[in-house]
Design a protein with these regions (language model features):
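Catalytic cores of nucleic-acid endonucleases
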Residues: 4, 27, 53-98
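Intrinsically disordered, low-complexity regions of eukaryotic proteins
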Residues: 16, 41, 52, 68, ...
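Non-catalytic C-terminal interaction segments of nucleic acid-processing enzymes
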Residues: 61, 90-148
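Acidic-basic catalytic patches of nuclease active cores, encompassing PD-(D/E)XK
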Residues: 1-36, 55-56
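Residues that flank catalytic or metal-binding motifs in active/ligand-binding sites
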Residues: 36, 45, 80
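Short, flexible, glycine/charge-rich loop motifs used to bind or transfer phosphoryl groups or to couple energy/partner
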Residues: 29-31, 38-40, 73-75
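Alpha-helix C-terminal capping segments
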Residues: 17-22, 40-44, 84
Length: 148
C-alpha cells in the first residue's frame, strides 16, 4: 500500500466515525487539512478524536499504534485527543490514549521499528498489540460489517 492509498482509506474512516458522532453530537466536524492534535472535534463536549483505520488487523491479529516518526515522538506519545476511534474491518473500538498506554505498560510491549512505506520518508516505531488484548482496554467496541 502507498502512503496516498493509506491516506484516502484513513479519510474514509474519519467520515465513517463522524457520521456516527452526528447522531448524538450534530455539531461535530472533521478538521480541515493536516492537524496533528486530532481528526474530529466535538464542540458540544470540547473534545478531539483521533481516528485510526487498519485494514490488516483481520489478517495479522494486531492493531498498530505509532510512537515515533523518524526519531521524533508521534502518535500515542504526542496525541492531544481525548479519544481514539480505532477501526478494523469488523470492529470500531473507542479507547482513550491513557488506556492504550496502560495496555502497553501492563503487558511490557515494546515498539518495533519499520522502514518507510512507498510515498513516506521516514521510519516508524510501532506497537503491535493483539486485537484481543486491545479490546480488553477499549471503553467500547462496536461490530461493523466488513468495511473496506
Amino acid at each position: 500500500m502507498s502512503f496516498q492509498t493509506d491516506l484516502n482509506f484513513g479519510e474514509q474512516g474519519e467520515l465513517f466515525v463522524l457520521e456516527k458522532l452526528h447522531y448524538k453530537y450534530p455539531k461535530a466536524y472533521k478538521v480541515k487539512g493536516y492537524y496533528k492534535e486530532w481528526d474530529l472535534f466535538i464542540p458540544e463536549k470540547d473534545v478531539g478524536i483521533e481516528v485510526k483505520s487498519d485494514r490488516a488487523t483481520h489478517k495479522t491479529g494486531n492493531v498498530v499504534i505509532e510512537s515515533k516518526y523518524g526519531d521524533a515522538p508521534s502518535g500515542i506519545e504526542t496525541t492531544k485527543a481525548a479519544w481514539w476511534a480505532y477501526i478494523t474491518k469488523d470492529n470500531l473500538y473507542w479507547i482513550t490514549p491513557d488506556k492504550i498506554k496502560e495496555c502497553i505498560k501492563d503487558n511490557n510491549l515494546e515498539a518495533r521499528e519499520f522502514p518507510p512505506v512507498e510515498g513516506d520518508f521516514k521510519k516508524k516505531s510501532l506497537y503491535l498489540i493483539k486485537e484481543t488484548l486491545f479490546k480488553k482496554y477499549a471503553k467500547r467496541s462496536e461490530r461493523i460489517d466488513g468495511r473496506n
